[in-house]
Amino acid sequence: MKGNRIITIGRQIGSGGSEIGMEVAKRLGIQCYDRQLIEMACNYGELDQDILAEAEEKRPNPFLYSVPRQMQNDKTGRGIAINDMVFNLQSEVIRRLAEKESCVIIGRCADYVLREQPGVTSVFIYADMNVRIACLMERRRITRDEAITLIKKTDKSRRNYYECYTGKRWGAGASYDVTLNSAELGLDTCVDLICSLYERKQEGDAQAR
C-alpha cells in the first residue's frame, strides 16, 4: 500500500454521499468502489451474488446464522453467520484494493477495515432530513411517506451494521476524520473539500520523501 491514498465515505441515504464519492474519484483520476464490492467479494469467495447482496451492510441475523455447507470454503470460513462471512469477504477485498491502488470506497465499514493502514482519510456525509426526503422523492419517484420509511429503515440498518462490526458510533464526528453536511455545503463544495484534503496529503507525502 506504500504511496496509496484511500478515501472512505460513510453516508446517510439521500445525502448524496455516493454521488460525491464518484465525483471525487473522477476528479482525482482514481477508481470509486461501491456496489461492485458485492460482485468482487462474490468472485473472491466463489459465492452466489444474490446471497451476499441480501446480507450486505446488514447486522447479523439469527435466522441466517450459519453458512450453508455447500457455500463453505477456505475463503468464506466455516460455521459462521452469513453476515459475518459477507463482512469478512468484503473486508479482504477492501484490504487488497488498498494495497493495489489509490481509490474511493463507499460504505462497508471501510474506515474501520483500513484503520491501521496509513494514507486513509475517512469521511461521513450527512444532510438535513427534509433535504434527504426531497432527494429520494425525486430520484426514486416515491411519496413523502415512502421516503421517510426508507430513510428510517436504511439508517437503522446501516447504524446497526456499522456499530456491530466497528464498536464505534455511526455518523458521529469522533468516528471519522471529516464529517460534511451536504445540504449546507452543497455537493460541489463537499467534492472540492475532499479533493483538497487528498491532494494536500499527497503533497505532504512527496515532501516527506
Q: Over which residues does each language-model region extend?
A:
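Pre-Walker A (Motif I) flank of P-loop NTPase domains
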Residues: 3-11, 101
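Glycine-rich phosphate-binding P-loop
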Residues: 9-25
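Short beta-strand-centered segment that lines the nucleotide-binding/catalytic pocket of NTP-utilizing
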Residues: 31-42
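ATP-dependent small-molecule kinase phosphotransfer cores
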Residues: 42-102
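Small-molecule kinase domains that catalyze NTP-dependent phosphoryl transfer to phosphate-bearing small molecules
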Residues: 61-67, 143-187
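NTP-dependent small-molecule kinase module
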Residues: 91-95, 164-209
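RNA pseudouridine synthases
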Residues: 97, 103, 110-116
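Conserved phosphate-donor/acceptor-positioning beta-strand/loop module used by diverse small-molecule
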Residues: 116-139, 144-152
